[in-house]
């Protein structure tokens, strides 16, 4: 930015202000005369008023008259009249008086005397301009006269001697005290700025303190303060103004600093070891004096010591009492020592202070023990009674000279009963007892009478004396006797049972056959008891009561009884398993289905198969025997557990469960007969799903539905025709969206069994009569073909001589039992609409039902992929469905519900998006084992032997798809696994149930025939009908699904 322009403008503005201030303003006012119409100009000039100039400052302590006049005032009114100037204020008409005077004519103000700033730092002079009448011509003016300061005052300390204190061993830079000094000179001026300095320290060994020159704070220089070395310091501090300059004024003060004591000295005992002697059985109040030395301040808690025992005084024989005046500990004996128990003692003592140690020496403190060796001197001791009193029991049937007990004195030197003493009775109330002078045996002098009992009140207390004539010593013992009531006089005392407990804790007992008397003595009171009669019996008493445990058991019993009705409601109570009234949990991965009776007709009745018992062959057998045929599977299925038996499998369990289930793939066996049913999702109900794959599956399903809906003709909407009147009948605008719909009668397939006959008539089907029940069966049993039998590619497969002729019958007939019975429909939880069933039966007398043998390998996760759309050329499925090239290279194949274990699904199952074409092949419900997808749809080799089925249903081809008839093949053999294929469609395709050669799916294990019959021609005009679209050149084919029900006999 260019500042030159702004500089020029600023200079011009300042110049104009200066010119204006120093010049006069003249204003011309125009006066218009209305009488004569003339205009006059009057000039009005404003003159600048000069009132005063700034007053000059006065320095204190000097003669300022040379600066007179220090100020001058002037009023503009002086030009027109006479003006008198006057002043007032401090120093004029207020003390101090007469410092300032004014010339009333000229307005000059003069100073007349010396001023002191410390007395009056400034003066305020009030100036007035008066006329001759004494009236103010101007407003009063305040004139300030400032007094300049000079350094004429020294610093002054608030105290001549400052006192402070600080603990020893304090950290460096610890605040001790703050000095306070003031200066009367002008504040915030160099003349009043004080600088502090320590000029002397006592003792002066080394400087221990520092002072802040600006604030006067005294702090420690280091942490070497030691009260034991110097207890007090004296400092001399100087304060100088003008910040300590040489021309400044100064003052001094004293500082006394006391060093406070802390517990930084570890106390110790004067001697490290002591040796003393003491006689046994004596007490001593001043056995030993222990002096403690501590360098801390005397009589303080840091100096007072406490002596304590570290070890050796476990019996609490000694105590130490401290003298706080001398810091001396006195060792006392408070409990007699026994020479026989111990001859010497080693005491270990330690010392500490009452106060806690300072943190500076806390880590240095280590406990130092001092040893005291105590020697116990033996003395000759007299006998004593231990314990000093004993209690006995005397019964009413005890007579004269009966023994009450023994009370002997013990020799303390040997610890045994004394043999040098004699015993005499001391206090003996009622003269009841007598004592043996040598043995100390107590006996009754006479039988206790009732009068003695009443006199003593049942309690006797006497004394016994032991006298040692050699030592001239006597010991006294106390005898306590409990006299029992005289109500027990009838008891007999034959032989006493005496049990004595001595002071050593040992029990001695003597017993006889009769338990009449028992004498007991305890350690504490030495109680001897004599119980007459059946004493042992009296000790036994019943103590039976109803406690909390019994109450708790009763409450628990009632609670269990309350749970019985609830348990009866929950359990089946012997009812049939899987009863119709119960609920069956639906697993997460189960595929729901609408049963045939959900559409029309009653629910089929379940059949009893309890008599169907499989016969288990030996473990080394390679075949599976068939089950006796006594019923037909309707709503019941059997769960089986299998074992591998080499080439075949052995069934180890059989369970009857009500429900609907389809059979799996038949096993390779030497003979097989019965009804074959398809698998269902019930077999994989317990398996989990791969959620990532399921998410992809649902996305593909949604795309397929979108593409399908886009290709379908819309109903109930206005059709768009490119050329009106061409390809559309007259009056076609209406609800009929598709001409071909008039001839579409596929909706009759879903009407149910009630309308089956009507549907057959509408479709023009040929009606076959029911079989005669008296038709004789053949006697030949069906035998499965060997595993290595080559299947036939086209045409009809060779029929085994063991089978009867193949007959196409209606859905209502079914062979079972010894004759031909009317069958119930085979229900599949996944079967919507009609299905194609291939049945093989024998002509023997007894037809056995099929045995559905499951693989004992854990079921893999099964993923259902529905409507995966892709072109045939991109999928490269010619190896699996052998069909000729279609007329359009962009043929589309729609595969619905491809069921395979998810653990082995390859990435090649994802087929590219289809292109529009006029020919469409729809394959629905393809259930393919991984072993059968060896071609372009390669699977993981670990599932090569999976026993699964492939069912292809509703194969719809366009007008150009005519080469499928009789040439359909599926590549990739299953190996040892059998397969049943059922294919339906509008084209003339066929699938051989006996087998397909060329590496196709081997069906040799079935031994029957499976054919597709009653298929409508694909040359229907429905596939040539042009669907309305936006472009006339785009042709699309409508997909019509056909399916019928056939049985091949």
Swiss-Prot record:
Q: Where is the composition biased (Low complexity)?
A: 509-530
- Spell out the SUPFAM superfamilies in the cross-references: Cadherin-like (SSF49313)
GO MF term list:
calcium ion binding; gamma-catenin binding; toxic substance binding
Which UniProt keywords are listed?
Calcium, Cell adhesion, Cell junction, Cell membrane, Cleavage on pair of basic residues, Cytoplasm, Glycoprotein, Hypotrichosis, Membrane, Metal-binding, Nucleus, Palmoplantar keratoderma, Phosphoprotein, Repeat, Signal, Transmembrane, Transmembrane helix
Instruction: Using the UniProt annotation, give all residue ranges assigned to the region (Disordered).
Output: 485-534, 1014-1035
Q: Which residues are glycosylated?
A: 36, 110, 180
Instruction: Recount the UniProt induction comment for this entry.
Output: Protein abundance is reduced via proteasomal degradation in response to P.gingivalis infection of gingival epithelial cells.
**PANTHER family the UniProt entry points to:** DESMOGLEIN FAMILY MEMBER, DESMOGLEIN-1
Annotated disorder = Palmoplantar keratoderma 1, striate, focal, or diffuse: A dermatological disorder characterized by thickening of the skin on the palms and soles, and longitudinal hyperkeratotic lesions on the palms, running the length of each finger. Erythroderma, congenital, with palmoplantar keratoderma, hypotrichosis, and hyper IgE: A syndrome characterized by severe dermatitis, multiple allergies and metabolic wasting. Clinical features include erythroderma, yellowish papules and plaques arranged at the periphery of the palms, along the fingers and over weight-bearing areas of the feet, skin erosions and scaling, and hypotrichosis. Additionally, patients manifest severe food allergies, elevated immunoglobulin E (IgE) levels and recurrent infections with marked metabolic wasting.
* Protein name, per record: Desmoglein-1
Q: Which organism is it from?
A: Homo sapiens
Lineage in the entry? Eukaryota, Metazoa, Chordata, Craniata, Vertebrata
Originating gene? DSG1
